[in-house]
Amino acid sequence: MISSRVHSGKSEMKKTYYSTIYKPAEDSFLLADVLKKEIPKLIKVNSNLSLLEIGSGSGIQLQTARKLGIKKQNILSTDININAVKYCKKLGFNCIQSNLFAKIKGKFDLILFNPPYLPENKYDKEKDTTGGKLGSEIINKFLRQARLHLKKEGKILLLTSSLTKNINWQGYEKTKLTSKKIFFEELMVWEVRR
């Protein structure tokens, strides 16, 4: 978890540095819970499982995947936020600054994405939470690009919200793995395959 304590000097810089990174919340914890169930099953079949996380934020999913047995050298992550990239690198992960798959080469067994999924409104225009006017614009762009980076038998674990409208699942099969109602929405984690 990211520290927000402030003591002096360097700690003040840390507060500013970390304050720009999406911090784990209910959505992050729900996806981590799914990883705890899914990764052990996947590793039994493929001990050399490769993982790509788009939008790594604080690195919670990377840390979960590593603890569950995915080899560190088989984990790659991206984030559009350079501070998130630096933080994940400090945690020891291979992380690059990229807008979705723009700087990604290769194919992966497992792709994770906890996207910005809320519809934009006049009160919340944050890049790390809003996914466009309908909330689905970033997700749809991700789904269009992901097929080029997913191995034939690979799968995507994607988090969405009941508030997200018009997700284009064309060309994919999806299965809802879990859901959780919180406040004004329902969060869902989907297993997505080509």
Residue ranges and their predicted role:
Residues 2-5, 17-37, 56-70, 78-194:
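S-adenosylmethionine
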Residues 42-46, 104-106:
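Glycine-rich phosphate-binding loop signature in dinucleotide/nucleotide-binding domains
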Residues 46-48, 72, 153:
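A general structural motif
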Residues 75:
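Conserved "HGTGT" condensation-loop signature of ketosynthase/thiolase-family condensing enzymes
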Residues 48-57:
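Conserved class I S-adenosyl-L-methionine
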